[in-house]
From Swiss-Prot:
Range of residues in the leader sequence: 1-18
Keyword field contains Hydrolase: yes
Hydrolase recorded as keyword: yes
Protein name: AAA-ATPase At5g17730
Cofactor entry: Mg(2+)
Known catalytic reactions: ATP + H2O = ADP + phosphate + H(+)
E.C. designation(s): 3.6.1.-
Keywords noted in UniProt: ATP-binding, Hydrolase, Magnesium, Nucleotide-binding, Signal
Gene Ontology terms, MF aspect: ATP binding; ATP hydrolysis activity
A single GO BP: response to stress
Length: 470
């Protein structure tokens, strides 16, 4: 049983304290007389700093976006890099897997701390989210969240290693992230989210490539050669004083492969696509903010620009009805973003416009420097048909089918688009049956066109037009 008698006596401690106090009182006058006051103050200050030492840790905050709205690519590199640093001490992790991915993607949860060792020093990463709860704005009769929750990562380390971290470790993280991205590159398709005024992405899984692309072989080689020159000429663009970007105009009737060519370019270059719907952009300032949010090595796509918004020509006077629309986006604002000073805010970018009616576009949109290459996507010719037959029916170019000569004769002119030919080839897996069906369709279509030409005085079928401008 516990008893107070078992407690040690306090008498020795009291005696020692009394003796120590007596010695201090005796020494104090001697120290005050022999030690100068400035030295006394220095010793007291040093003792206080020792007892109340300031933290020796520095924390760098890496936000997902910079204040001007541009995406912080250092944040993306940090996310990729620390995702490879999973350890057994982690308490919470976020995992995901898209249907096109084989492996599970691991992301750190909010507040999770990850340690890393670099050249013998320890650094710590921490994922954070800054929630903006009261940042709603009234915008053109609708409510939007001006700034969604801001994500950031914190990098902490001892202050004495600041120079090593800034000049060596962070470039190391960026280079490692680039290697990782190249190894597991998953293309993204970005679209504009009006609710948050920012880009949101999904995985781009379009199978179109230049190998399977049904288009004129000469035109295909020209496009690929132009892309290759663009990628390797970074120093050239810098030397001549031009932004490192390239513009392509794809025009032609529906079903001629304009969208497939965009996907083939993205797969060829491993570039993400930013699908810009001009009708959802309210004003020029929003367009600039969106372009600042795009990354380098990407494609800015504007499909059907002739009917997206009223950008046909600046020479037409504006009527009262033109000013009643909700969009105040102007042609001059668009031109400034794709070719003005704002176009220099980024490197290795491609701008692609598609249209069905090239003649409706303002000439200012079409000049070199904005649209450097005009690619006419026309009706199906015999070379395009052979590519489609190889893709859909497995027919070889070296062993042509007996119906090829008749198809070559019937397909001349503006008869069918590649999409219409592909639809006919998909109706049957037997090459004989599929090609016989295509021959019937071609004969019927030619009769319709010849009748139409006779009524309109066109004077027969026109030869397929191939326009290619550099």
């Amino acid at each position: 049983m516990f008893s107070l008698r078992n407690l040690p006596s306090l008498a020795p401690f009291v005696s020692a304290y009394a003796s120590l106090t007596g010695y201090v009182m005796m020494i104090k006058p001697f120290l005050e007389m022999t030690i100068p006051p400035p030295l006394q103050n220095y010793m007291i200050s040093y003792l206080n700093s020792f007892l109340h030492s300031t933290p020796s840790t520095l924390t760098l905050i890496i936000d997902d976006h910079i204040k001007n709205g541009m995406y912080n690519e250092l944040y993306g590199a940090a996310q990729v890099y620390i995702s490879t640093k999973v350890n057994h001490n982690a308490e919470r992790l976020r995992i995901s897997r898209d249907r096109s991915e084989k492996n599970v993607n691991i992301h750190f949860s909010v507040g999770e701390v990850v340690s890393d060792i670099y050249q013998g020093i320890e650094v710590k990463w921490r994922f954070c989210v800054d929630s903006n709860k009261s940042n709603m704005v009234h915008y053109f009769g609708e409510h939007f969240k001006l700034n969604p929750d801001r994500e950031c990562v914190e990098l902490s380390f001892e202050k004495k290693h600041t120079e090593l971290v800034l000049n060596s470790y962070i470039p190391y993280v960026e280079s490692k992230a680039k290697v990782i991205n190249n190894e597991r590159k998953i293309l993204k398709m970005y679209s504009y989210c009006c609710m948050y005024l920012k880009w949101q992405s999904v995985n781009l899984e379009h199978p179109s490539t230049f190998d399977t692309m049904a288009m004129n072989e000469e035109l295909k080689r020209s496009v690929m050669g132009d892309l290759d020159r663009f990628i390797r000429r970074k120093d050239f663009y810098k030397r001549v004083g031009k932004p490192w970007k390239r513009g392509y105009l794809l025009y032609g009737p529906p079903g001629t492969g304009k969208t497939s060519l965009v996907a083939a370019i993205a797969n060829y270059l491993k570039f993400d696509i930013y699908d810009l719907q001009l009708a959802s952009v309210r004003e020029d300032a929003d367009l600039r903010r969106l372009l600042l949010g795009t990354t380098n090595s990407s494609i800015l796509l504007v499909e059907d620009i002739d009917c997206a918004v009223d950008l046909h020509t600046r020479l037409q006077p504006k009527t009262q009805d033109d000013t009643k629309g909700s969009s105040m986006l102007t042609l001059s604002g668009l031109l400034t973003c794709i070719d003005g000073l704002w176009s220099s805010c980024g490197d290795e970018r491609i701008v692609i416009f598609t249209t069905t009616h090239k003649e409706r576009l303002d000439p200012a949109l079409l000049r070199p420097g904005r649209m450097d290459m005009h690619i006419h996507m026309g009706h199906c010719c015999f070379d395009v048909f052979k590519t489609l037959a190889s893709n859909y029916l497995g027919l070889s170019h070296d062993d042509p089918h007996h119906l090829y000569p008749e198809i070559e004769r019937l397909i001349k002119g503006e008869v069918l688009t590649p999409a219409q030919v592909a639809e006919e080839l998909m109706k049957n897996e037997d090459p004989d049956v599929a090609l016989e069906g295509l021959v019937k369709v071609l004969k019927r279509k030619r009769l319709e066109l010849e009748k139409y030409d006779g009524e309109t005085g066109r004077g027969g079928l026109r030869k397929p037009e191939l326009q290619f401008f550099l």
